[in-house]
């Protein structure tokens, strides 16, 4: 006889109501029919593609590092719409509403021609080619070679109202009972951090901290050998409860293995047959080959063809529905645009005479320099929105970011303090205690510790959308252009109808 018995495990009890719920911004943000266009200046930068060029004493950076394999993190600030002089009081009533911006569209403009830039290392850890080996090659104490290659092709941008979050692998702390770790591979852990302007992205060697995980300084190219390669943490940003770090993103990556090499040096993890006697599970030994060659294989990738048919830039993108709860609302009147693009990765070669008197070609009297340039222009379509000053709405905004209410000059009234305070006279007297420290009244920037390319749009807004390329595209695709045209239909005057009276002739009688 079969009987049903309940499980002996713990019983799940759902939480008692009410449960805190994060609302979508569309539930409490009221959108208006007022749109603004904002466009930045031409943003230019010039530098060395591989490293910072410092002065002779190393204290000053004379030429900054500007590489096509760097992230460009723009921090775009817009004017406060609550300080606008709006004549229509039905749109903005300071007693009932606060105004905010919403991003409806953007276009990331890029100048300069398409091009492929190579990177490399004059002492690259490459023992020999393993794709088509012709003979056995035993390693020596130094087998490094001068190797260059083109990196993985990357096009990517992420927009949000807080900085983009990146991830990378780094050395993890060693457990206390692990013993000596000399000569052993360190444990790894995944770390997160804000992607700043100038951070390197992955070019084919992984998103790792090369400062701590590349002891020989020869496993990767010069531009990342002393850097942390980051990759956007899309999993964390897509699961953000408020959705502020990534409204939406676009990315395109491609690569293929162009060369197959093997590292020089001792193999850290030996093949089990030779190390722990695995009874020939991995290879059969031979009398003529008593020692195995190095088995630390790796490829150098290539980004392949660069074409204008697959460009994410110089084209508009419209935000209809964001992936998170924040549907494009720019809290604190700022937007963060994180860009990665190495399809315009040409490095200039500039040659000058070392003594100024060279007539014939002599390589020893000619100095070669390298420079990389980048050109950007950012355009936005902003929609004016308003938020009602209601208790439920303000409670959620305060839980999300209390600094928003402070910028709106709103705050919760504290409970009255009835305690008696002490006030001393003669504060500078030696007989009186030291005065209390005066608190800093200047508001601290929550992102002041990070490096961004600041773009000020305070005087770049315009209501004349039809005067700008992105504005005309927005008017056309949204149907506002046809609506404006229909309102200007001219009314034709009706022509007056002429009426002629027929004169009746008198009949003559004889």
Swiss-Prot record:
Gene Ontology cellular component annotations, sorted alphabetically: host cell nucleus; T=7 icosahedral viral capsid
Family matches, as Pfam families: Late_protein_L1
InterPro entries registered for this protein in UniProt: Capsid_L1_Papillomavir (IPR002210), Capsid_L1_sf_Papillomavir (IPR036973), dsDNA_vir_gr_I_capsid (IPR011222)
Chain coiled-coil ranges: none
Subcellular localization, as worded in the UniProt entry: Virion; Host nucleus
An example molecular function term from Gene Ontology annotations: structural molecule activity
One of the GO BP terms on file: virion attachment to host cell
Signal peptide range: none
Disordered: annotated segments: 126-147, 488-510
Sequence similarity: Belongs to the papillomaviridae L1 protein family.
Quaternary structure and interacting proteins, as annotated: Self-assembles into homopentamers. The capsid has an icosahedral symmetry and consists of 72 capsomers, with each capsomer being a pentamer of L1. Interacts with the minor capsid protein L2; this interaction is necessary for viral genome encapsidation. Interacts with protein E2; this interaction enhances E2-dependent replication and transcription activation.
Chain's role: Forms an icosahedral capsid with a T=7 symmetry and a 50 nm diameter. The capsid is composed of 72 pentamers linked to each other by disulfide bonds and associated with L2 proteins. Binds to heparan sulfate proteoglycans on cell surface of basal layer keratinocytes to provide initial virion attachment. This binding mediates a conformational change in the virus capsid that facilitates efficient infection. The virion enters the host cell via endocytosis. During virus trafficking, L1 protein dissociates from the viral DNA and the genomic DNA is released to the host nucleus.
Protein name: Major capsid protein L1
Organism whose genome encodes this protein: Human papillomavirus 22
Lineage: Viruses, Monodnaviria, Shotokuvirae, Cossaviricota, Papovaviricetes
């Amino acid at each position: 006889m079969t009987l049903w018995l309940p499980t002996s495990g713990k019983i799940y009890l759902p939480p008692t109501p009410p449960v805190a719920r994060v609302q979508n911004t569309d539930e409490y943000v009221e959108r208006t029919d007022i749109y603004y266009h904002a466009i930045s200046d031409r943003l230019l930068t010039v530098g060395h593609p591989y490293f910072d060029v410092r002065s002779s004493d190393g204290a000053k950076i004379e030429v900054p590092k500007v590489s096509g394999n760097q992230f460009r993190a723009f921090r775009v600030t817009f004017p406060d719409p609550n300080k606008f002089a709006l004549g229509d009081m039905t749109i903005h009533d300071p007693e009932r509403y606060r105004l905010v911006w919403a991003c409806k569209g953007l276009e990331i403009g890029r100048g300069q021609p398409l091009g492929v830039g190579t990177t490399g290392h004059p002492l690259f850890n490459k023992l020999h080619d393993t794709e088509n080996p012709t003979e056995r090659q035993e390693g020596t104490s130094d087998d490094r070679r001068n190797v260059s290659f083109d990196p993985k092709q990357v096009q990517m941008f992420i927009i949000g109202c807080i900085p983009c979050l990146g991830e990378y692998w780094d050395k993890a702390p060693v457990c206390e009972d692990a013993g000596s770790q000399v000569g052993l591979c360190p444990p790894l852990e995944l770390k997160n951090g804000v992607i700043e302007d100038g951070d390197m992205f992955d070019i084919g060697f992984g998103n790792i901290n090369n400062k701590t995980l590349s002891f020989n300084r020869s496993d990767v190219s010069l531009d990342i050998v002393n850097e942390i390669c980051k990759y956007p943490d899309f999993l964390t940003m897509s699961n953000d409860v408020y959705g502020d770090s990534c409204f939406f993103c676009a990315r395109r990556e491609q690569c293929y293995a162009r060369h197959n090499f093997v590292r020089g040096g001792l193999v850290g993890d030996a093949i089990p047959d030779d190390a722990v006697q695995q009874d020939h599970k991995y290879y059969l030994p031979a009398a003529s080959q008593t020692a195995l060659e190095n088995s630390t294989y790796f490829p150098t990738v290539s980004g392949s063809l660069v074409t204008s048919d697959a460009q994410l830039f110089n084209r508009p993108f419209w935000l209809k529905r964001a992936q998170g709860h924040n549907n494009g609302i720019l809290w604190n009147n700022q937007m963060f645009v994180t860009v990665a693009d190495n399809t315009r990765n040409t490095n200039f070669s500039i040659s000058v005479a070392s003594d100024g008197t060279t007539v014939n070609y002599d390589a020893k009297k000619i100095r070669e320099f390298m420079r990389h340039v980048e050109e950007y222009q950012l355009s936005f379509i902003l929609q004016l929105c308003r938020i009602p000053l209601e208790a439920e709405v303000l409670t959620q905004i305060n839980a999300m970011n209390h600094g928003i209410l402070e910028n709106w000059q709103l705050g919760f009234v504290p409970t009255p303090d009835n305690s008696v305070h002490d006030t001393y006279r003669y504060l500078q007297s030696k007989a009186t205690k030291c005065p209390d420290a005066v608190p800093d009244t200047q508001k601290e920037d929550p992102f002041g510790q990070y490096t961004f390319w600041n773009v000020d749009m305070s005087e770049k807004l315009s209501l004349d959308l039809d005067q700008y390329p992105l504005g005309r595209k927005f008017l056309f695709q949204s149907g506002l252009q046809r609506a404006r045209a229909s309102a200007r239909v001219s009314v034709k005057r009706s022509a007056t109808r002429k009426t002629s009276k027929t004169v009746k002739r008198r009949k003559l009688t004889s």
